[in-house]
Amino acid sequence: LTLTANEVEAAFKDGKIASMIGIEGGHSIDSSMGALRMFHKLGAGYMTLTHGTNVPWADASTDTAQADGLTKFGEEVVWEMNRLGMLVDLSHVAPATMHDALDVSEAPIIFSHSSSRAKCDHVRNVPDEVLKRLPQNGGVIMVTFVTSFISEEVRQHGIQRGEEADRLRAMRGGTEESVQTGRAAWIETHPTPKASLAQVAD
């Protein structure tokens, strides 16, 4: 477990894996700078600005945009994280939020678990125009093994699976038991494609 940049560098030099405590989603601070500071004091080294839904001050990639990126308070959250020495994690956030955070952050940012949107067009992935900004910021995009983030074939299969579940709900009156039975039968004839380590490396 590492709590500072110096500890991360020391672990790397020793050939060890550095692990950090993270907060996955800015909803955890409930729009409170005091809560953010307390999480940092308790050992949190980074925070993902959003999770699956928007927070009042930042848009998520898997929700309908409300703030068009970061609000003024969202910018202040990024600045406070910079001041505290917490890494700003842009996985889960909308592209507009990515750009706004890169505009205001005075420290390198991370994507803790995302992939390239050019490789797999999942909304959780990072567009090329954002990736092109990382060298100047000094930030990094970290490895993810989520198959629907690295394989377009797996992503499409997930969409089809969801569409089939919707069809079954409409056709069978919406009882969850009948939907699950029909879904299991569909999966048996439409097995989930495999993703590979080569796709992770790409």
Model regions: which residues?
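Extended, charged catalytic domains and RNA/DNA-binding interfaces, predominantly
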Residues: L1-D202
